[in-house]
């Protein structure tokens, strides 16, 4: 790997070989998945729609709209196989008011960003914010945080994080290039009434300061300094 040329086609070939090995050997073969084309389409769909909250029925309905008929139970079976293989992780929705976890809706993140990039190599609409969100999720899990997502009244907090009795809330975005973007990212956090730490995480080099108790922080600073 150290001597691999940093050329797009070489990188793609290398990552794609890894994807084929993981999908074909570690998931499809071990779980005796017969509908391999559907399984691959399912994983690509999840990679492309990272930002979305899903139910297994919603996934099944979408696939039916693409003329792919598959039972909801089969979707559940394939998703569970992917999680057991440790390349796909699900995040449940958290109700801040009632402090409850809902198991119906989930977001899905990839344990290796390279796998996700290989799956989406052909896709021209990759949103950098989706990649950053996945990076932050992986970092949180590695540091022992429980991670959930909150959605209410069409506003979403990307991550509700718990570690023991401690909590924090995170929004992840690429750049806050306009005042309207800044307001959109800060607004959900400003509606949370407790005193736990709240962060808007971006790649802006000048990311710093607070707005009504919500800290704006550069993603590198967050990954390095927030334990």
List each model region and its residues.
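Domain-level recognition of nuclease-like catalytic cores that cleave nucleotide substrates
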Residues: 205-227
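Active-site ExK catalytic segment of metal-dependent nucleases
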Residues: 167-177
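Hydrophobic/aromatic beta-strand patches that form the interior of the parallel beta-sheet core
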Residues: 109, 170, 199-201, 215-217
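Arginine/glycine-rich "motif VI" loop of SF2 helicases in the C-terminal RecA-like domain
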Residues: 187-196
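Accessory nucleic acid-recognition modules appended to NTPase machines
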Residues: 3-167
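Short, hydrophobic beta-strand segments that form beta-sheet elements in well-ordered domains
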Residues: 149, 195-202
């Amino acid at each position: 790997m150290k001597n691999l040329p940093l050329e797009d086609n070489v990188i793609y070939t290398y990552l794609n070989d890894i994807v084929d090995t993981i999908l074909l050997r570690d998931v499809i073969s071990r779980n005796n998945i017969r509908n391999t084309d559907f399984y691959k389409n399912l994983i690509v769909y999840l990679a492309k729609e990272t930002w979305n909250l899903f139910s297994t029925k919603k996934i099944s309905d979408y696939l039916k709209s693409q003329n792919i008929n598959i039972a909801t139970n089969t979707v559940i079976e394939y998703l569970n196989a992917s999680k057991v293989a440790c390349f796909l992780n699900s995040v449940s929705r958290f109700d801040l008011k009632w402090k409850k976890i809902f198991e119906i809706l989930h977001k899905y993140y990839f344990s290796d960003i390279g796998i996700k990039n290989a799956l989406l190599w052909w896709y021209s609409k990759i949103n950098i914010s989706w990649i950053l969100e996945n990076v932050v999720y992986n970092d949180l899990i590695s540091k022992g945080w429980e991670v959930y997502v909150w959605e209410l009244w069409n506003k979403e907090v990307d991550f509700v994080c718990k570690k023991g009795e401690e909590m924090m809330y995170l929004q992840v975005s690429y750049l806050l290039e306009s005042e309207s973007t800044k307001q959109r990212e800060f607004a959900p956090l400003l509606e949370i009434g407790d005193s736990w730490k709240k962060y808007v995480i971006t790649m802006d080099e000048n990311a710093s300061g607070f707005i009504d108790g919500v800290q704006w922080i550069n993603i590198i600073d967050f990954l390095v300094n927030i334990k």
